[in-house]
From Swiss-Prot:
Keywords recorded for this protein, A-Z: Cell membrane, Membrane, NAD, Quinone, Translocase, Transmembrane, Transmembrane helix, Transport
Enzyme nomenclature, EC number: 7.1.1.-
Topology term for the membrane: Multi-pass membrane protein
Family indicated by similarity: Belongs to the complex I subunit 2 family.
Gene expressing this chain: nuoN
HAMAP family: NDH1_NuoN_1
Database matches in PANTHER family: NADH DEHYDROGENASE
Protein's organism: Desulfitobacterium hafniense (strain DSM 10664 / DCB-2)
Bilayer-spanning residue ranges: 8-28, 37-57, 73-93, 110-130, 131-151, 162-182, 203-223, 235-255, 271-291, 300-320, 341-361, 386-406, 421-441, 464-484
Disulphide linkage map: none
Protein's recorded name: NADH-quinone oxidoreductase subunit N
The reaction(s) this protein catalyses: a quinone + NADH + 5 H(+)(in) = a quinol + NAD(+) + 4 H(+)(out)
Gene Ontology CC: one annotated term: plasma membrane
Length: 496
């Protein structure tokens, strides 16, 4: 049943008003008085997050504008994720943003508009709606990546991201145009019904082009080459937001598109083969390329590439759901298990990664460096920062009893239950290999000689953000039930 009520768009409307309103405030306030942008943004995000949580549990599911936009718990879960990510980034940037004297007023509004674009991607029921959300998110990141006006690396990263991002968007848009040419519609449900059970060459080409476009956004190999340079050159807080929320938005759109593909068995089979190959090479190359890195932001870039490979394993479980009868598994159950694993892991990935980047931001601000060697003796210079970074990278490695272990358990068990044990084995082996380069950071922090390096003071909002990320990472590893139930509810909303 289609309905159009503005109340269903409340979260998106709030974010749009806040983003544009903060731009206006930044124009009105004199440059020396723009410190007030931080508390305004912080309280605005807290209020919006509270509403998004309420909407998730009590808002219900509906489609409106002829299915162009979906108000369901799947989208609601991602709205919470994007707001949590934005909130943690804002908490870690109060002092960092203060040094941007000329551009301080634009930082927070751009962050909110990027989050708005992500929400549009997560809720899109139409390929063009999804593309509009993607472009809103991407254009704001073009600006934010190049936000260091006097840093050549930041400017270079911004130009590279602009050129490569535009190319990937063009590929994605061409894939959408092929689908429109085949079906006469861009509305996902209509497209799914129009494609039928068989696929021709054009259908397969459209699928590959769409997956290539998504692959760029989530840093899948071989569409990952942009990530190391952009992660290294961008301001640390923007790298954090790009590595977490932007990646999650790409997965949200990919999952909705994959549900569309499953109606066409030929497309589903082609997509399954492609994703199996991409997942394997992404996990392997991402982890192996992290070993020689000397810059921590480049290392985290390759870590993020590997993490994308793990998450794709959950999407593979969704793909198998279209033909799992051969394994004696209920397709709906297989579908929900795969999506649940993806959603759970993305949320804990946000906390672990942003905890790590909160430390990276403060070390970069205090020392002016993001080289791993400059983390020597950090445990003595800033015990809290060292503890947060240690727990964050161990969670990313999947070490129990941290949340990352539970997340990988959900992802790998979803495909094991459906017979694809080999891809889970690759994921497990690569997770164990990743422990080496993660522990190399821990080793230099606790055993390295930090003599002559400055203190790394952590206080105020940044301290709270670090502690909160660390606590959530521990608690969700010991007691994952509440988040797992939310992920299950969100996944189930896609099959209602």
């Amino acid at each position: 049943m289609m309905s159009f009520e503005l109340s269903l768009l409340s979260t998106e409307i709030i974010m749009a008003v806040l983003g544009l309103g903060l731009f206006a405030v930044g124009l009105i306030l004199p440059r020396g008085s723009r410190q007030g942008m931080f508390p305004l943004t912080l309280f605005a995000l807290l209020g919006t997050l509270a509403y998004a949580v309420y909407d998730f549990f009590y808002g219900g599911n509906a489609a409106f504008l002829q299915g162009m936009y979906m108000h369901d718990q799947f989208a609601g879960f991602f709205k919470i994720l994007f707001l949590v990510a934005a909130l943690l980034v804002v908490l870690s940037t109060k002092n960092y943003v203060a040094k941007f004297q000329a551009y301080r007023g634009e930082f927070y509004p751009l962050l909110l508009l990027a989050a708005l674009g992500m929400m549009l991607m997560a809720g899109a029921g139409d390929l063009l709606t999804m593309y509009v959300g993607l472009e809103l998110m991407t254009i704001t990141f073009y600006i934010l990546v190049a936000y260091h006006p006097n840093d050549p690396k930041s400017s270079e990263a911004g130009i590279k991201y602009l050129v490569l991002g535009a190319a990937s968007s063009a590929v994605l848009l061409y894939g959408i145009s092929l689908i429109y040419g085949l079906t006469g519609s861009t509305q996902m449900f209509t497209v799914a019904m129009s494609l039928g059970a068989e696929a021709n060459t054009v259908t397969i080409l459209a699928t590959v082009m769409m997956l290539a476009g998504f692959g760029f956004k989530i840093s899948l190999v071989p569409f990952h080459m942009w990530a190391p340079d952009i992660y290294e050159g961008a301001p640390a807080p923007i790298t954090a937001f790009l590595a977490t929320a932007s990646k999650a938005a790409g997965f949200a759109a990919l999952v909705r598109f994959y549900v569309l593909m499953m109606y066409n068995h030929s497309m589903a089979e082609a997509g399954l083969i492609l994703l199996l190959v991409l997942a394997a090479i992404t996990m392997i190359i991402g982890n192996l390329m992290a070993f020689p890195q000397k810059n921590i932001q480049r290392l985290m870039a390759y870590s993020g590439i590997a993490q994308a490979g793990y998450i794709i394993v959950g999407v593979i479980a969704v793909s198998i759901a279209s033909s799992v009868s051969q394994w004696g598994v209920d397709p709906v159950s297989a579908f929900v298990d795969g999506i649940k694993g993806v959603l759970f892991y993305l949320m804990i990935y946000v906390f672990a990664n942003l905890g790590a980047f909160a430390v990276i931001t403060h070390v970069a601000q205090s020392q002016g460096s993001t080289e791993i060697k400059d983390y020597a003796g950090l445990a003595k210079r800033s015990p809290l920062a060292a503890a947060v970074l240690t727990l964050s990278v161990l969670s990313l490695a999947g070490i129990p009893p941290l949340a990352g272990f539970v997340g990988k358990f959900y992802l790998f068990s979803a495909v094991i239950n459906q017979g694809h044990v080999w891809i889970a084995v690759i994921g497990f082996v690569m997770s164990m290999i990743s422990v080496y380069y993660y522990l190399s950071i821990v080793k230099i922090m606790y055993l390295g000689d930090g003599e002559g390096l400055p203190e790394v003071p952590v206080h105020g909002a940044a301290k709270f953000g670090m502690i909160f990320s660390m606590i959530v990472t521990i608690v969700l590893g010991i007691y994952p039930t509440p988040l797992a139930q939310m992920a299950l509810t969100a996944a189930s909303s896609l099959v209602k």
